[in-house]
């Protein structure tokens, strides 16, 4: 039996490396991508049983969907997914299944076109001053580092972000290193976890360094508009339109919604 991000089952399927989707492995065998298994469990995944297939989920690096063949039909589970591609990240594959379990994090929302958001973000980077970008260390930080590198910017990052960025061969400087200390003498761009970044933090840093400091959020969550100086809806989830498009392309016999606005999304699909 396979536990879909559950404490039950002989096998544990972990779709990606975000903490809200990970469970204790204990003595179970693990089904996941190499990236997820190494980051979360410090081991290689086990070979999946016959009848199990993994697919790209388009959410973050190493994110996977799964299908499981049973006597009653094929079960598909998306985990978190993003159908459309974005900077350096392929979109989710359309899986073939009879019973679909799909996330619904942004089932009520509509994201602006990624190209427009990306272009606005690029323009923001040209502003004068120190720029502190709030991004989750797993997934979002890798995406933002890719964009910064494309713009010729090498960001200062935490040790964890630096370690994870190695999987994508990205360019960054670790905070606290001699190189970062030299960068701190002028304008620079840094990526920090969201819990460490807010306007009060920026004000204190600005006073200490006598430099203009801008905080930048890169999330589709509405609270980012008041927490940061700038906020860009760079989302690693599908919005309502994409979720519906995904369901239509899969065309399963039965749909189960989970994570987020699951009841709302279920009623929308009826």
Question: What are the roles of these predicted feature ranges?
Answer:
Residues 1-12, 19-132, 139, 150:
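His/Asp/Glu-rich metal-coordinating catalytic cores
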Residues 13, 77, 99-101, 132-134, ...:
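Structural motif
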Residues 60-68, 81, 85-86, 99-105, ...:
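Active-site-proximal loop/helix segment associated with metal-binding centers of metalloenzymes
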Residues 91-94, 108-185, 254-270:
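Binuclear metal-ion centers of metallo-dependent hydrolases, dominated by the metallo-beta-lactamase
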């Amino acid at each position: 039996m396979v536990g879909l991000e559950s404490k039950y089952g002989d096998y544990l399927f972990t779709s990606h490396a975000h903490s809200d989707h990970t469970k204790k492995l204990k003595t179970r065998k693990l089904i996941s991508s190499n990236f997820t298994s190494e980051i979360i469990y410090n081991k290689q995944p086990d070979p999946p049983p016959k009848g199990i297939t993994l697919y790209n989920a388009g959410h973050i690096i190493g994110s996977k969907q799964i299908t499981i063949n049973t006597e009653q039909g094929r079960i598909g589970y998306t985990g978190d997914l993003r159908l459309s591609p974005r900077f350096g990240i392929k979109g989710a594959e359309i899986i073939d299944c009879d019973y679909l379990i799909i996330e619904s994090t942004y089932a009520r929302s509509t994201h602006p076109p990624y190209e427009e958001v990306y272009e606005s973000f690029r323009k923001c980077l040209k502003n004068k001053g120190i720029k502190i970008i709030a991004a989750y260390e797993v997934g979002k930080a890798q995406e933002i580092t890719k964009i910064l590198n494309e713009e010729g910017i090498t960001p200062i990052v935490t040790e964890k972000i630096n370690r994870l960025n190695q999987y994508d061969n990205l360019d960054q400087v670790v905070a606290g290193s001699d190189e970062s200390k030299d960068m701190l003498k002028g304008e620079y761009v840094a990526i920090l976890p969201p819990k460490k970044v807010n306007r009060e933090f920026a004000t204190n840093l600005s006073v200490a360094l006598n430099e203009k400091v801008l905080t930048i959020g890169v999330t589709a969550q509405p609270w980012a508009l008041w927490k940061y100086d700038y906020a860009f809806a760079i989302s690693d989830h599908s919005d309502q339109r994409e979720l519906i498009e995904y369901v239509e392309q899969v065309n399963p016999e039965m749909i189960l919604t989970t994570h987020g606005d699951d009841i709302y999304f279920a009623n929308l699909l009826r």
